[in-house]
Design a protein with these regions (language model features):
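Short acidic/glycine- and proline-prone juxtamembrane loop motifs at membrane-interface regions
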Residues: 12-20, 188
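Specific aromatic-rich, kink-prone transmembrane helix
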Residues: 20-37, 198-199
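Perimembrane helix-loop-helix junctions
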Residues: 56-81, 92-93, 194
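Aromatic-rich transmembrane-lumenal/periplasmic boundary elements in polytopic membrane proteins
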Residues: 75, 80-120, 124
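Transmembrane helical bundles and short interhelical boundary loops of multi-pass, membrane-embedded
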Residues: 100-117, 173, 206-247
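Aromatic/glycine/proline-enriched transmembrane-helix motif characteristic
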Residues: 107-182
Length: 247
C-alpha cells in the first residue's frame, strides 16, 4: 500500500488527508469482518469526522446489516455520536455547534462542475468544464446512484448473498465505493483513493484479479499527473472508457 503511486502522489507529494480517513475505513472493514461492530462503527465515525467521502462506505454497512443480521440499526447512531465527540475541541474553542452539523451540507455545493478530472460516467457524456451540466445532472446523479445501490440491495436480498464471506464482502465494498465515484456529481480524481486502497487490500488478501488494482491505480496516476503537472498521456474521455469497463 505504501508503495502505491496513489499513496505517494496523494499523501507524500500533494499532502492530502485521504490516507487518514481511508485508514480508519480499512480498520472499520477489518473489525466488521471480525464481528466487532461497535469498534467498526467507531472507526467509521472517526473517518467521517475527517472527510465527507466516508459516506461512500455507508451502503456497505446497510448491505451487511441486511445480509448477516449481525449488526443492529442502532449501531448506525454511533457514527454521528463519534463525529460530534471528534469535533468537541473545535466547540470548546468557540466554534458554533450548528457548524458541526452544517459544514458537510455546505460542502456538497462546492465546486459546481459535474466532474473534476474524474474519469467517471459524466466524463463520457458531457464536458465537465461546462457548469451547465452540473445543474442539469446534479439531482439526477443522486437519484441514479441511489437507484444503482438499491438494485444491489435487492440482489443481496433475493440471492441471499453472504457478506460474511471475506472475498464477497471486499468485492461488494469496492463495487459500492466505485458506484459512488462513477455516478455522483462533482467527483475529483482524489476520490478514487479509497477505491484504490480497497482493491489493493482485496488483491493482497484474496490473491486474485491482481490486474484490477493495477489498472485502477494507473488511472488515478493519470489524474494526478494531469492536475499536478498538466501532463496528459491519454485523454480524460478515453480514460473514462477504461474506467467504465473496469467498473
Amino acid at each position: 500500500v505504501l508503495l502505491s503511486t496513489t499513496v505517494i502522489f496523494n499523501s507524500s507529494f500533494w499532502a492530502q488527508c485521504d490516507s487518514i480517513y481511508t485508514s480508519f475505513i480499512i480498520l472499520a472493514i477489518l473489525f466488521l469482518h471480525k464481528d466487532k461492530p461497535i469498534a467498526s462503527f467507531v472507526f467509521i465515525g472517526i473517518a467521517f469526522a475527517f472527510k465527507l467521502q466516508t459516506v461512500f462506505i455507508i451502503p456497505v454497512l446497510l448491505y451487511y446489516w441486511i445480509s448477516t443480521k449481525k449488526i443492529s440499526i442502532l449501531h448506525f447512531f454511533i457514527i454521528p455520536a463519534v463525529d460530534v465527540i471528534m469535533c468537541l475541541p473545535a466547540i470548546i474553542m468557540g466554534r458554533p455547534f450548528i457548524d458541526i452539523i452544517t459544514i458537510y451540507a455546505e460542502q456538497t455545493d462546492y465546486g459546481k462542475l459535474i466532474q473534476m478530472n474524474c474519469p467517471n460516467f459524466y466524463a463520457l457524456i458531457c464536458d465537465g468544464n461546462d457548469i451547465t451540466y452540473y445543474y442539469l445532472f446534479k439531482q439526477f446523479s443522486v437519484f441514479l446512484t441511489i437507484a444503482v445501490l438499491g438494485i444491489m440491495m435487492c440482489i443481496i436480498i433475493y440471492k441471499k448473498v453472504d457478506l460474511k464471506n471475506l472475498e464477497t464482502f471486499l468485492l461488494t465494498t469496492a463495487w459500492t465505493v466505485f458506484t459512488c465515484i462513477m455516478f455522483l456529481s462533482s467527483m475529483h480524481e482524489r476520490y478514487g483513493y479509497l477505491l484504490d486502497i480497497i482493491l489493493i487490500v482485496y488483491a493482497a488478501v484474496i490473491a486474485k484479479h491482481l490486474w484490477i488494482p493495477i489498472v485502477s491505480t494507473l488511472i488515478s496516476l493519470r489524474g494526478y499527473c494531469y492536475y499536478l503537472f498538466s501532463y496528459e498521456l491519454i485523454s480524460l474521455k478515453f480514460t473514462a472508457i477504461i474506467y467504465t469497463a473496469l467498473y
